[in-house]
Amino acid sequence: MTATPPAPPRRCFVDEAGDATLFGARGRVLVGEPGCSRFFMLGALEVRDPVALATDLTALRLQLLADPYFKDVPSMQPARRKTAIAFHAKDDLPEVRREVFRVLLQHDVQFHAVVRDKQRVLDYVRARNALDERYRYQPNELYDTLVARLFKNRLHLGPELEVCFASRGKADRSAALRQALQTARARFEAKWQRHVEARIEARQAAAAHEPALQAADYFLWALQRHYELGESRFVQLIWPKVGVVQAVDETAVAPYGAYYTKKKPLVAVTSGLG
């Protein structure tokens, strides 16, 4: 009798949009000021075949770099270290973004995200400071809590999970990120009284070296455009690839926030690239 081969590990690629900063010099509140994002969001893109995705994205980038149409575009010049090195939705031309989205929608991927309203986070920080004047908010605190939220209900879905986080600055935060994943495991087990046996690995990588992180960036960019600018056509485009978007601070209906899924879309979903 032939043994059943083990299930392949689930592979997730995690990036952020916006920033977790609340304060500037001398404690000045930055939320609401120009240049400071109103929302901070963390997203995980689960990719069935990261090698195939990397192959297609790399081939697309080389094809675009060889296209005379983009010859003199600043972001396509290697010295600028932008699109010539890696796709990054914020820096890429609209024509480039269209082609990247076209490739992403052809792959077996699923996107999950958690969104925080930084004004509500600021309210929490102020309330906590009123109770404990020694408390000092750190941006990594918000990031790590969102990691735990993002993976709380996803760690039990397979025997092995590999999570690649986009590098943030020069510090190696692999240990802190592993701890955040363990927090997610503990919260799931406490809530459901069920042990999670999955083996979990966490690592960091630069997006330039991991095309799947570039893909995650594109999904987050689409979500960010909706929340920050009210521009929803990109999130409509990617919605067939979305699992769940949790808007923690949308508490008008339920205290735990709002969950958007295929059955309950964030906005009316349309199909096609338009």
Predicted segments with their positions:
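Phosphate-ester processing/binding pockets and catalytic centers
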Residues: 1-274
